[in-house]
Amino acid sequence: MKFGTTLRNAVYEPWRESYVDYAKLKKLLREDDSSRKDDTWTDEDAQAFYAELVNSQLEKVTNFHKSTYQKLRDRTAKCESKLDPIAKAVQEAEAPASSYAGAAKKPSPSDGERKRILKEVLEELDLITKDINELEKYSRINYTGFLKIAKKHDRKRGGRVSSIRPLVKSRMADVPFNNEDYSPLLYRLSAMYSFARQNLEGQDRPLSLVESIAGEESYITHKFWVHMDNLLEVKTIILRRLPVLVYNPQTEKIAEGSQQDPSITSIYFDNPDFKLYSNKVEHKTDASNLRLRWYGKLSQKPEIMFEKKTVKTENTSADERFPIKDKYIQPFIKGEYHMEKAIEKRSSRQVSEEALQSFKNSIADIQSFIKDNDLQPVLRANYTRTAFQIPGDDRVRISIDTNLAFIREDAIDADRPCRDPEDWHRRDIDDAEMEWPFKSIRKGELATFPHAVLEIKVKNDKDYEWIDDLMNSHLVKEAPKFSKFVHGVASLFEDNVNTFPFWLSTLEEDIRQDPETAFEKEQAKKQKQQEDELAVGSLMKSKSHSSYKPGGLSPVGSPTDKTGSYLDRRASRQSAMKA
């Protein structure tokens, strides 16, 4: 489907006039005017196009997003104000009588008034939630439109000298509509929904978000980009607390000096319409991805894992996985083999009935998922991983991926397939044991990533001061929703998809930061977090979960055990500010 059609279908009618005028920009490019004899593209034409694109269309979208988001925040605050008298009345009713002795109590709303307020707030929350979803869709489709029209310009009117796509990406990296974090606002809405419903329906107070997280084992994942200039310092900060771990699916042990970090290969699946990609970019409920993954070279006969991950919420997912031998992968994809031998082996090992059934379910689910969605291997991601973790201690798990390369693995173009359609992987790569930087791969089939990818997984979202310091330092660039699968598809199949991840424009900027500027941004961010958490504190009736509180002890040693690095100087500044 052409992007112009996609844009028309995506328009939210009340905001129609505020979208990028894609048709007008195409007209300025004279893309569809094939009857015109003189197709000369003058400097005046170029200036008029760029002015309309950046000064008019981009400015229009930016201003609309900014004003709409502020209105949503104002509407949210108004709902909190309406609920405040009810929240205070609930707290006073639950508190011991002596707690309020001598205190002047404000009159509580009557039962009828309370119900009216709660119903009105719930109705308004539904409208706010709907508008937030529409605003996110609005931002994404406009972001994609700017990238698409810039590419059209470069193809028809550009060249190495007059290419504007990098300039457009750079401009968009600075505007809020492509990097707005809606999470704090959603957290406030969630608290009000919970409070209003339990008071309207008379239910016992359920566990707050903070309490429910503390009551179960879960991991909170934080993702960052690391500029190669900062990579060594980041590694040394981590390895002073956590040892480098040999990354192997069967064993875990501390790495020895002679060992190299292993390479990891993932082959991702999708269909010719890139349905799985679109679902993931648009954050659809139960968006899934499917991949084959192994460590090292395929010629070394590594264990190959079939893995399906389904996102349930922003921080939780359901995983299904099982090992499969090389020779069975293609028949499994085609539905000719159903892992009978593997099931038989497990049955003979006296595996528990529950584990055996789970294994069978994973096999059946993944095979039907392939068939129902017409999936094929489309993308290879290859990278080198350094892992940090105390063996046997999973409270903190950190990985750093470098030399990240994406390679087309598809057979979508029947005339020029990148992969033999009758095979599950590219033998020109694996038989030749190609490695980074994959110089033999044809142009257009390879994309590399300029930064290292840092991933920090913390059990139960526990705070560690040294991790908090690292995450908020100038050494890393936050990339909360970064996905290798999404980035690879967006980089190599941009003509096949009509939606892009917001982080693409950020790649055009220098992610290195001045330490002082980064520190000031951190303080402003924490102040904003505190304000948002304070707004819902009375509704949650529990201590707000703030990242600004002192961290816990490191899994290895004390967080105060620091050397003369940047983080030392940063800690000194924080101490001075608190004094």
Language model features with spans:
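Phosphate-end processing signature that detects enzymes handling 5′-triphosphorylated RNA
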Residues: M1-A579
